[in-house]
Every structure is written in C-alpha cells, then in structure tokens.
C-alpha cells in the first residue's frame, strides 16, 4: 500500500511540474509575439546601436531617421 501511495504522489508531481513548465513556455512566447507585433505595427524609431524589432534597421527615403522593418 505504501509503494502505491508513493507512486501516485510521484506521478502527480511529474504531471504538475510538466504542466507548469509548458505554461511558462507558452506565456513567454506570447509575450514576445505581443511585443514584436506592437513594434512592427507602429514602426518605432530605432535607437543608436539598438533595434526595436529585429536585427535589421534600414534608412528610408531622404530622411536620415532609421525605422525598423
């Protein structure tokens, strides 16, 4: 009886841990996609030595300001 109880506790622990890990991964991915969508939609200005969206900044037209693609 004791082995059966320990096995059940172990299985519940593994399932709980796996569920929390999956939830954390989904939450971080959703947060990243949300930030990227906001940046792409508004074409925020790139700061010096930093890109707001991706690793590519390009100059557009005669205006020397840089915008994210």
UniProtKB/Swiss-Prot annotation:
GO MF: calcium channel inhibitor activity; toxin activity
Positions bearing the site annotation: Essential for stimulation of [3H]ryanodine binding to RYR1: 67, 69
One GO CC term on file: extracellular region
Tissue expression remark: Expressed by the venom gland.
tRNA processing among keywords: no
Source organism of this protein record: Thorellius intrepidus (Scorpion)
Disulfide bonds: 39-53, 46-57, 52-68
Keywords: Calcium channel impairing toxin, Cleavage on pair of basic residues, Disulfide bond, Ion channel impairing toxin, Knottin, Neurotoxin, Ryanodine-sensitive calcium-release channel impairing toxin, Secreted, Signal, Toxin
UniProt function note: This toxin stabilizes ryanodine receptor 1 (RyR1) opening in a long-lasting subconductance state (55% of the full conductance state). Furthermore, it triggers calcium release from sarcoplasmic vesicles (45.3 nM are enough to induce a sharp release, and 50% of the total calcium is released after toxin (100 nM) addition) probably by acting as a cell-penetrating peptide (CPP). In addition, it has been shown to dose-dependently stimulate ryanodine binding to RyR1 (EC(50)=17.4 nM).
Family according to the record: Belongs to the scorpion calcin family.
Keyword Signal: yes
Listed name of the protein: Intrepicalcin
Subcellular localization(s) per the UniProt record: Secreted
Organism domain of life: Eukaryota
A Pfam family that the UniProt record links to this protein: Toxin_27
Span list, region Essential for stimulation of [3H]ryanodine binding to RYR1: 59-60
Maturation-removed propeptide residues: 28-36
Signal peptide as annotated in the record: 1-27
Domain-level remarks: The presence of a 'disulfide through disulfide knot' structurally defines this protein as a knottin.
Lineage: Eukaryota, Metazoa, Ecdysozoa, Arthropoda, Chelicerata
